[in-house]
């Protein structure tokens, strides 16, 4: 049985979970994640303590607990378990308070709390823009895009666009490159005026064939030779047009998004 990991927070737990994933990914081990958000009272802290102790009995080993609890009383209750408790405040915030000689707000995940902030509104606007301009659905207002992702079908354009919008408030459109474009030897007409905003995604042809076969098994669309043709043509077109691009084959969405932001020199803070 994989080790149990609790993500305990008095809010959504997004910050704690992101941190936990970053740390746990360093180990070649599967983990069973148990999310415990909104622990905003001592009663809920005691209920969480009970869950942790139950896991100890069931697993025969102590679990790992990542916590971002602001309330010291609730935090002490959770720390009363026999688990390995990793307190993000104690580990990182308190030493920074001493170094900076300042008291922190002790409000983990502040950026997620106020739905009326300008940043929140910008993010929602970016998400709506990316959804409206997914897969070339609309050519309207392409001039408003921060970036336009191009590439063959199933090369990772849609998830990357949405990740950029949700995490960074980037207005990311995406547009497919199709066989008709390769036959003409030109970019799709609606994109011609926006070369400076374009960024390309490619992918290993064999991997592309596997992905497409999940969607349309046995089709020409998914055939290895067709995938090789489309990728070769797409990469040749991007080189001709001076479009920066990368292969998404062995990269996570986070890595792809970070590279795009660096390449197009767009400075945005993650929400």
From Swiss-Prot:
<keyword id="KW-0547">Nucleotide-binding</keyword>
<comment type="similarity">
    <text>Belongs to the pyruvate, phosphate/water dikinase regulatory protein family. PSRP subfamily.</text>
</comment>
<protein>
    <recommendedName>
        <fullName>Putative phosphoenolpyruvate synthase regulatory protein</fullName>
        <ecNumber>2.7.11.33</ecNumber>
        <ecNumber>2.7.4.28</ecNumber>
    </recommendedName>
</protein>
<dbReference type="InterPro" id="IPR005177">
    <property type="entry name" value="Kinase-pyrophosphorylase"/>
</dbReference>
<dbReference type="GO" id="GO:0005524">
    <property type="term" value="F:ATP binding"/>
</dbReference>
<feature type="binding site">
    <location>
        <begin position="151"/>
        <end position="158"/>
    </location>
    <ligand>
        <name>ADP</name>
    </ligand>
</feature>
<keyword id="KW-0723">Serine/threonine-protein kinase</keyword>
<dbReference type="GO" id="GO:0004674">
    <property type="term" value="F:protein serine/threonine kinase activity"/>
</dbReference>
<dbReference type="GO" id="GO:0016776">
    <property type="term" value="F:phosphotransferase activity, phosphate group as acceptor"/>
</dbReference>
<keyword id="KW-0418">Kinase</keyword>
<comment type="function">
    <text>Bifunctional serine/threonine kinase and phosphorylase involved in the regulation of the phosphoenolpyruvate synthase (PEPS) by catalyzing its phosphorylation/dephosphorylation.</text>
</comment>
<dbReference type="InterPro" id="IPR026530">
    <property type="entry name" value="PSRP"/>
</dbReference>
<keyword id="KW-0808">Transferase</keyword>
<dbReference type="Pfam" id="PF03618">
    <property type="entry name" value="Kinase-PPPase"/>
</dbReference>
<dbReference type="GO" id="GO:0043531">
    <property type="term" value="F:ADP binding"/>
</dbReference>
